A protein has these predicted regions:
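Charge-dense, E/K-rich amphipathic alpha-helical interfaces
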Residues: 6-9, 47-51
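Surface-exposed patches in mature extracellular/periplasmic domains of secreted proteins
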Residues: 39-49, 104-105
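Soluble non-cytosolic domains of exported or imported proteins
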Residues: 15-23, 80-84
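Short loop/turn motifs at secondary-structure junctions and domain boundaries
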Residues: 42, 50-57, 110
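Charged, alpha-helical coiled-coil and linker scaffolds that mediate dimerization/oligomerization
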Residues: 18-19, 23, 27, 33, ...
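Short hydrophobic beta-strand micro-motif common in sensory/regulatory domains
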Residues: 59-61
């Protein structure tokens, strides 16, 4: 999970219990993380780090699910600056779907589920990534 200006540790203790649907989003996050290979995609394009430099990349995807958890629409709402990383984020959500048993309370008046998902690729000597909602 990425939080600006918060050091990474074993756990980030937030008031998660007040988030009604955290279990669903944790499942979504785990499914997407299994598919997301931004570090591999990045290293294939820039194995030495000389092309794109050492700059962390952050993008967000606006996700719309059908009531059964299948993907209806994906939209890159914040670009990372590298199209191939944004494409990888979209691909990973598509491949991870469907997201079974979405809570009824997440459905909007249109019967669809809308949320934004973030992808943070930390570029150091060895790229690392974090996925968050």
């Amino acid at each position: 999970d990425y939080l600006r200006d918060v050091d990474e540790g074993e756990k980030t203790l937030l008031n998660r219990k007040t988030e009604r649907y955290w279990a669903f989003f944790d499942r979504v996050k785990l499914q997407i993380a299994e598919e997301y290979s931004a570090h591999k995609v990045y290293q294939r394009r820039d194995p030495t780090g000389n092309i794109y430099g050492v700059k962390d990349r952050y993008s967000t995807i606006r996700v719309t699910l059908n009531s059964d958890g299948s993907v209806r629409q994906l939209h890159v709402s914040r670009r990372s600056g590298l199209d191939f990383l944004d494409d990888e984020a979209v691909r990973s959500v598509r491949e991870a779907a469907p997201f079974h048993n979405p809570p009824e309370g997440l459905k909007d008046q249109d019967g669809l589920i809308h949320f934004t998902f973030g992808f943070y690729l930390e570029i150091t000597n060895e790229p690392n990534f974090r996925i968050f909602r």
